[in-house]
Amino acid sequence: MLINYIMDIIEFKDCSYENKHLVGGKCSSLGELYHLSQKLNFHIADGFAITTHLYDSFINQNNLQDIIENTLEQIDYNNIKNIEDNSKMLIDKISNGTFSESQQQSIAVFYNKLCEKYNIVDLDVAIRSSAIAEDLPNASFAGQQDTYLNVKGIENVLENVKLCFASLFNTRALSYRHSQNIAIEEVKISVAVQKMVRSDIGSAGVAFSLDPESGYNKAIVINSAFGLGELVVSGGVKPDEVICNKATLKDIEADPIIMKKMGDKSSKIVYSH
């Protein structure tokens, strides 16, 4: 599918690995998952990507590019207080920036369209970071930027999108990029706006297409716990773990499960209405 590459917002159905430079790693994967869901008839929570093009425009129209570059050049990465102070300054500058009228209208149109799809006024959404430098071969950016859950109403969506933009410069992200010698020019951020799902009656987790500890690429590793996935991602709970053999997944007579290990799952995070 041909995409207009100057678009500020792209729905999940039009996201793919082909426009990863616009929508980042997470949104491109969500787009691929959306396409797969249409073929195999399963559901995913729908949404849209606010692209790196809109992020660039936001930074430039608020005259922040020079401030960002000058600040990054003078950070003392051997001084944690210095990193924190400069991080806070950049986060404050970005979160206090303003969207143009056309940007606000564009985001509102797609948010309202999502509300209409699910027939819910002021639909609860997750505001999720999707950086273009996510999961490089020699580096992983999982958890570096921020995610905001259960965001309701267009004004709150706009504010949390700015916070997501700003999280590109939080202390852990700055320190990690410096340790990996990744220049800021290599990193931009897209933002996923995605419908929230029920967490009180379900579970969440992560799946890896290889063993993240050993690098063994013939296995799939799945970790899952009750409620939202935050505790799994942050290591705050011991999840269930299942390891599958890729070679036997398509053999209906074979058991693909190599190992199952039950975690204590001692707590869960749910949305308190």
Task: Tell where the protein language model's regions lie, with residue ranges.
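Short beta-strand-to-turn element immediately C-terminal to the catalytic PLP-Schiff-base lysine
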Residues: 148-152, 207-210, 243-245
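Short beta-strand segments
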Residues: 128, 194, 221-223
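Short conserved micro-motifs at the rims of enzyme active sites and ligand-binding pockets
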Residues: 138-140, 204-205, 231-235
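Conserved catalytic alpha/beta cores of large enzymes that bind or transform nucleotide phosphates
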Residues: 219-273
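Phosphate/diphosphate-binding loops
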Residues: 195, 199-207
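N-terminal beta-alpha lobe that positions the nucleotide/phosphoryl donor
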Residues: 2-192
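Glycine-rich phosphate/pyrophosphate-binding beta-alpha loops
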Residues: 202, 209-212, 223-230
